Amino acid sequence: VALHEGKRTNSEINASGVLKDASSKLFRGTIDFQHGSAESVGAEKEDVLLMGDDVVNQTIPLILCAEEDVKGSHGASIGELEQGMLFYFEARGISREEAEKIVAKARLERLCQDTEDAKTAEYMHQIIEEVI
């Protein structure tokens, strides 16, 4: 939850992930503009790569607004690997399975780069290496 209580506050929620096999996830991103948070801006964005017929993705964005002069936005990009990208990899002798790993790792590594705290970024990097 991004809670805006004062004037001219900013928030940005970025959720990114990869779902494979029979995995599932629920994302409830909430931006809450409280009374007194005039001139505030809140945004939430989600990017999910679906890699399996049995994955379940649930996205529930919510913007609460008790103030008039605010800007709130939300968006989601959810989908499978594009055929053109798969063709690109296959034309270079890279299997579909390896292509999926490369793309999934790249998406998750981007989260590490966007993380300001070095210890957190390193911890995330270690988990990505273990999982993929």
Residue ranges and their predicted role:
Residues V1-I132:
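Active-site gating/interface segments in enzymes
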